[in-house]
Amino acid sequence: PRVLALFAQHYPQIRLKVQVNSTRMIAKNIINREVDLAVVGGEIPDKFRKNLLIEHFVEDEFSLIIPKSHPFASKKQITKEDLYHLNFITLNSNSTIRKFIDNILSQNQIETKQLKIIMQLNSIEGIKTAVSLGLGAAFVSSSAIEKEIELKTIEIVKIEKIRITRTLSIISNPECYKSKAFEFF
């Protein structure tokens, strides 16, 4: 969001249209020339890769956020075992982000089916609000919680020996004309 805001401030004459969708759907829209450019974080299906120009953009780290009132808030780091004592608020189980996080946790010998998921929501904003109200903990992109960290409504806690990151990529159709707006971005 911050990158888009900066771009819009620098180039107010360029019309931005922001869509949130699955990486698969966005890739299809790029190939079908319905969208010029997209920033995606999910895995791009192999069948679409040959028809796309893919440029790695930035590393996106996910943070474990907890309410300020939680006993772990005074710790800067917790163990993997501590995760089993948290109530989690997550995206729904079909979410690409949720699957990605579950996969990383599983690779680190964390039984995701044993985690206490008390709430599944459809938006990051809803998750951040629920955490700030003290309802539970969640994994969210660090770039999505800058305001909450500044306002001190939540705490970030590191997990010993675990770091969850993904690469955000810019994708476009190599066969399409690249406008000046595209080049500016």
Language-model region placement:
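Short beta-strand elements of ligand-binding domains
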Residues: 37-42, 66-67, 91
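Flexible hinge/capping segments at coil-to-helix
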Residues: 51-62, 66-89
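Alpha-helical segments flanking ligand/cofactor-binding loops in enzyme cores
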Residues: 27-28, 55, 81, 128-129, ...
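Short beta-strand->loop
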Residues: 52-62, 150-164
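Secondary-structure junction motif
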Residues: 72-73, 87-109, 178-180
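A late-sequence structural motif
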Residues: 155-185
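Hydrophobic hinge/microswitch elements
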Residues: 22-35, 41, 97-154
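Central regulatory/effector-binding core of bacterial HTH transcription factors
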Residues: 1-45
